[in-house]
Amino acid sequence: MFKKKKIGAIDTLIDKDFVLRGNTSFSGGLRLDGKLYGDLTMEDTGGTLIMGEHSKIKGKVTVETAIVAGEIVGDIKCHDYLELQPSSIIKGDIEYN
């Protein structure tokens, strides 16, 4: 049957009260509960993005793995695994390999 993807460890946590402005890159695992106004890219393969229910990204997202429960205003490109939770809102194109 279907198997759940094993998600790696979270290396970085952005709290719900935190707002980032500008393009950002990360490596490892990122848990976003706050807001990001700018593009988000991974620095190396294996980058995992987990977005909380009240999180928001306004910009282009390029990651290996993503679990989205928040809002993305912009395009998202996932290279390996993409999971959209019922609360997710995507206002842009979705590209998945």
Stretches with model-predicted labels:
Residues M1-I7:
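Terminal amphipathic alpha-helical/low-complexity segments used for targeting or macromolecular assembly
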Residues E43-T45:
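Extracellular repeat-rich scaffold modules on cell surfaces
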Residues D11, D17, N23, S27-G29, ...:
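Detector for repetitive beta-architecture
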